Amino acid sequence: MVALPTMLEQILSVLMQYVDTAMVGRLGADATAAVSTSTTITWLIGSIPVAFGVGAMTQIAQAIGSGEKHKISQVAKVSLVFAVGVGVIIEAICMAVAPFVAGWMGASEEVAPAATRYFFWISVPIVFKSLNIVLSAAIRATKDTKTPMFIGVGANLLNVVLDYVFIYIFGLGVDGAAYATCISAVVSGLVTLSVFLGHKEFKLESSVFSLDKEIVDRMWRLSLPVLLINVASTSGYVVFAGLVSHMGTIIFAAHSIAVGAEELFYIGGYGFKSAANTMVGISYGEQNHDKYHAVCVSSVIATVAIMTISGVLLFIFAEALMGFFTNDPQVIALGTTVLKMVAFNEPFFGLYIISEGIYYGLGKTKYPFVIEFGGMWLVRIVSTFIGIHFFGMGLIGVWCCMIADNVIKAILLTVPLKTLWKK
């Protein structure tokens, strides 16, 4: 199954992130807050090349379905140019704003210096991260999901080993975690580039400066709505985290660790989303409506089933997960409560992300943007702001707003699926 290697890759990746977070968490709440200050900004940064990865994946999958070999090569070349260009621009911006990020995110005076240094160092390899994200998406579109899995797992193992060396052996603390992230990102980007250039489907015969205008235009048309979705979503996460960070170090640490702990439990949904994007794109390229319908039905059923199981497991192991990341009893207690709450949201979140994958595979990216923007900013952010500033709402209330956002988006994206592509 196309989804399984992607799911395994993400599971192992999150497990490595768990170890990473636990290593920093053992340094204390201030160290956790310093790293967490950059977390949502990092999501925003990563979401930009992800959008162009969707454009690459959709076009390559549809070209494979229609049997257009030359077009596959042309899309691959455009994808490489976009990956480098986007990475260079983002890296330049991040390096310029690095001194101000901690202040924007409301970090305390004790946390701000370490948070600033951490953000600077994880910004250094952004062009390599962009290469890894966009080119891995292109490779997955060929149904080769194993190679990106091996690269991703290797990079995360390297990151954990370097974390241990820099944090504990060299005693570099938060700075050591940043150095480890930087080095592993450079290595994974270079390896992905090497695999991409040697891939049998991507024969880059002409100069990278000779690009097919139609493919470039379609890359923009597909990627721009996804980019707006990701920016609306992740910038919303930044504002959301900023609102929580002003509630105190303990609350922010509990929130950040709980958000990270939950990642493992929605991996199944993201694995099927990536597979649905590829398989729906190929079905559309073949103009095979029956195959498309079968992919949609099986993807939705499998995603909801696996996310329901994930929700049950999250509820059962919530306290153990929080205890793995931190020794602080207040952080553990608060984080356990919100994780048990969000466990009931997992099936709805699964519906939301698998529906997005189906929309992307068909090249229909505008409607998901409208839904994402409305849900994030009108439901989650506005209600959280009002709740905190006018009703003294705590972290539990904040997470209720987040759950409401996910449920509404799931319903609004799932209902139109039957009419997306008619015979």
Language-model region placement:
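Transmembrane alpha-helix boundary and packing residues in multipass membrane permease domains
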Residues: 6, 10, 22, 39, ...
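Small-residue-rich hydrophobic transmembrane alpha-helices
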Residues: 32-92, 129-148, 254-312, 316-318, ...
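Short runs within selected transmembrane alpha-helices of multi-pass transporters and secretion channels
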Residues: 53, 122-140, 148-156, 177-192, ...
